[in-house]
Amino acid sequence: MDVPYDLNSYIRVLKLASTPSTDEFLQVSKIAGAGILLIGFIGFLMFAIMSLLPGVGA
């Protein structure tokens, strides 16, 4: 493992990287938020179904 080479590679990537524009950031935030809400809603539906069915779940 060549540490100086690895560090130079990381520095080169960080120099090429740029911060996203406000529009890009908002779009990514909305998509990530929608995904989190979708997963939460699916989990809630599973919990509700398991709670309503007799003999299934705790």
Swiss-Prot record:
Keyword Protein transport applies: yes
The similarity annotation says: Belongs to the SecE/SEC61-gamma family.
* Subcellular location, record wording: Cell membrane
What is the membrane topology noted in the UniProt record heading this document?
Single-pass membrane protein
Q: Which UniProt keywords apply?
A: Cell membrane, Membrane, Protein transport, Translocation, Transmembrane, Transmembrane helix, Transport
Give the organism the record lists.
Answer: Halorubrum lacusprofundi (strain ATCC 49239 / DSM 5036 / JCM 8891 / ACAM 34)
Question: Where does the source fall among the domains of life?
Answer: Archaea
Which HAMAP family does UniProt cross-reference here?
SecE
Q: Tell me, in a sentence or two, what this protein's role is.
A: Essential subunit of the Sec protein translocation channel SecYEG. Clamps together the 2 halves of SecY. May contact the channel plug during translocation.
Where primarily located? membrane
Query: Which residues form each disulfide bond in the chain?
Result: none
Q: Which GO biological process entries does UniProt record here?
A: intracellular protein transmembrane transport; protein secretion; protein targeting
Q: What is this protein called?
A: Protein translocase subunit SecE
Record flagged with keyword Manganese = no
GO molecular function annotations of the record: protein transmembrane transporter activity
- One GO CC term of this entry? plasma membrane
Complexes and interactors: Component of the Sec protein translocase complex. Heterotrimer consisting of SecY (alpha), SecG (beta) and SecE (gamma) subunits. The heterotrimers can form oligomers, although 1 heterotrimer is thought to be able to translocate proteins. Interacts with the ribosome. May interact with SecDF, and other proteins may be involved.
Q: Which residue ranges run through the membrane?
A: 36-56
